[in-house]
UniProtKB/Swiss-Prot annotation:
Residues 23-33 have a biased composition (Low complexity). InterPro entries: PPDPF (IPR026754). Disruption phenotype: Impaired exocrine cell differentiation and growth. Loss or significant reduction of exocrine cells are due to lineage-specific cell cycle arrest but not apoptosis. The endocrine cell mass appear normal. Cell cycle arrest is mediated by up-regulation of cell cycle inhibitor genes cdkn1a, cdkn1b, and cyclin gccng1. Induction: Expression is directly regulated by pancreas-specific transcription factor ptf1a. Probably also regulated by retinoic acid (RA). It comes from the Eukaryota. This is Pancreatic progenitor cell differentiation and proliferation factor A. Probable regulator of exocrine pancreas development. The gene is ppdpfa.
């Protein structure tokens, strides 16, 4: 966690992730020898990535090997996109719309407004 005080400086609230960033600016309020930019240690339960950045998997996920389809290209050809965070996929949305239209035509009602995305 981090806190941002009214001075605008970012301060780590947990010692494990504390990092003091040095400044080469001559008009800095802190001497650069005091704030040298300590390295954040590698968490003990997390495997290291080949890139050297253990945190990269949190932002970028697993990288595909060169020359292999990445899933997005194959999904783009079929027109389907899978969303992993629980949102409705394009295919499911189409099925719901078709079902809604068929149910409303069976009951003699006009189809309602489209489902919100």
């Amino acid at each position: 966690m981090a806190a941002i005080p009214s001075s605008g400086s970012l301060i780590a609230t947990h010692d494990y992730y504390r990092r003091r960033i040095g400044s080469t600016s001559s008009n800095s309020s802190c001497s650069s020898s005091e704030y040298t930019g300590e390295v954040i240690p590698h968490p003990p339960g997390l495997a290291r990535q080949d890139s050297g950045h253990w945190w990269s998997s949190f932002f970028f996920g697993k990288q595909n090997q060169m020359g292999t389809p990445n899933g997005f290209e194959s999904q783009q050809k079929t027109g389907t996109y899978t969303v992993t965070n629980g949102q409705v996929t394009c295919v499911a949305r189409e099925i719901v719309m078709k079902r809604h239209l068929s149910e409303s035509s069976d009951s003699g009602k006009e189809p309602g407004s489209p489902l919100p995305s």
